[in-house]
A protein has these predicted regions:
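Catalytic alpha-helical scaffold of carbohydrate-active enzymes acting on polysaccharides/glycoconjugates
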Residues: 1-119, 124-154
Length: 154
């Protein structure tokens, strides 16, 4: 039987993206997921919204120390890249805001885990040139914003 390669990443943020102040998924589901990942030997990348990580640094450290990669998912789950469609009540960052916001988010996560964070995923999967340029300038190695089929590789 052929082995199947799977990349597994989870976004860690408020319960409904940018629209609620609740963290039940973080506080209640994370321990369940960590147990499942450990039982099945599944490594994951957890893409943390930095504001969420700041609220739950012990959970970030627990995941990281369990061998899971810590990635960045923005500062406040804002639209960092180019909007693909309008979302009421949200506005994309200005191009000149992108690099400082990603840098601030990166610094928060790196302070929590104690090492460089090199993976990124845009909220809402809205990427763009300004994001790519900022990630390159900050030394990121992976942008998980675009699914693999985007690159015609499966």
């Amino acid at each position: 039987m052929r082995e199947i390669q799977v990349v597994f990443g989870i976004d860690v943020e408020t319960d409904i993206g940018s629209w609620t102040p609740f963290y039940e998924g973080v506080t209640k589901a994370t321990p369940i997921l960590l147990d499942l990942f450990a039982k099945k030997s599944i490594p994951v990348t957890s893409f943390w919204v930095a504001d969420t990580a700041r609220r739950f640094p012990e959970i970030v450290r627990e995941m990281d120390s369990a061998g899971h990669e810590t990635g960045t998912h923005s500062l406040y789950h804002e639209t960092v890249g180019d909007s693909l469609f309008e979302i009421p009540g949200t506005f994309p960052l200005l191009p000149e805001e992108v690099l400082p916001r990603i840098k601030t988010a990166s610094n928060i996560l790196e302070d929590i885990v104690g090492h460089k964070v090199v993976s990124w995923r845009c909220p809402r999967l809205f990427g763009g040139t300004h994001v790519t340029n900022a990630l390159e300038a900050l030394g990121y190695e992976c942008d998980a914003t675009y699914p693999m089929y985007f690159y015609n590789e499966q």
